[in-house]
Amino acid sequence: MDPQDCKCETGASCSCGTTCSCSNCKCTSCKKSCCSCCPAECSKCSQGCHCEKGSKKCSCCN
């Protein structure tokens, strides 16, 4: 599934199947990471990794 812009407010949940607290979250196929810096192909992103502001990859994928 391609990333989708859920247009959710910061701190709000979005309709990606799991709770998302990112503004304009990008939902990936695993539906466990909503941040755009967590690519769908990174399996570690479903393990509670976080995204640094301005980063292209989540903390687990660096």
Curated annotation (Swiss-Prot):
Keywords: Acetylation, Metal-binding, Metal-thiolate cluster. A divalent metal cation 3 binds at residues 16, 20, 25, 30. PROSITE patterns: METALLOTHIONEIN_VRT. The modification N-acetylmethionine is found at residue 1. A divalent metal cation 6 binds at residues 38, 42, 45, 61. A divalent metal cation 7 binds at residues 51, 58, 60-61. One of its GO terms (cellular component) is nucleus. Metallothioneins have a high content of cysteine residues that bind various heavy metals. Class I metallothioneins contain 2 metal-binding domains: four divalent ions are chelated within cluster A of the alpha domain and are coordinated via cysteinyl thiolate bridges to 11 cysteine ligands. Cluster B, the corresponding region within the beta domain, can ligate three divalent ions to 9 cysteines. This is Metallothionein. It comes from Xenopus laevis (African clawed frog). The lineage of its organism: Eukaryota, Metazoa, Chordata, Craniata, Vertebrata.
